[in-house]
Amino acid sequence: HVRSRRQRQMCIRDSYRNTNYVPMGFAYDYYLTQTEYEETAKATRANLLMRALVLTDEDAAVYGKYLTHLPEGRREELYYESYVQDCRERRATAASVFQMNNSGFHAEITLEKENLVFFSVPYDDGFTAYVNGQEADIVEVDEGLMAVLCPAGENSIDFVYQPDGIRLSRALTLGGIVVWLAYTAYFVWRKRRTKRA
C-alpha cells in the first residue's frame, strides 16, 4: 500500500499528538504543601502536579483558602486513567487566550471563583504581573513555576519581563553617552579654539 506524502505526514503528526495537552494558564481545585509533595513517591509526582498545585507552607497559609487541600486518599490514586481525567479538568479551567509578546505574555481567563491561575513558566524576579491592569503578586509554585491570584469573572493577565539589572544598565549606557558627547564637544571646541589662535 503506497501512501502519498501528505498521508505520511498526517500519520506522523497523529502519532505524536498529545491527547492530554493542557493549554497555558489554568486553575486548580486542589493544593498540596511542598512538604507533602516531597513525601510522595518520585515516580508519581508528575501525575500529582496535574491534580494539585504545590505551595510552600507559607504560601499555603495565605492562598490555601482559595483551593481545597488535597485529601490523602487522592494523593495515591495516580494512574494513567486518573491523569487523563485530571488533564481534562485542567483544560476546562484553561485560559481562552494565551499570547506571547516581546515583553512577556498575555492571557485571558474566566473563573467561577477567586483562584490562583497557574502558568508553567519558570519563576524569575524579572517578571511583573498585572491582573486587570493592577499589579499583582506572583506566587512561586510547583518547584519554581508561577501563579497569580485572580478574582471571579473575566480576567486579563499580563506578565511583563524585564531582566534583572536592565534599569541600571540603561542608566549607565545613557550616562556613558552623555560623557562621550561632553568629551567630544570639548575636543571640538578645543580644536576650533586652537585654529583661531
Task: Label every model-predicted segment.
Residues 17-86:
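Catalytic cores of secreted or luminal carbohydrate-active enzymes
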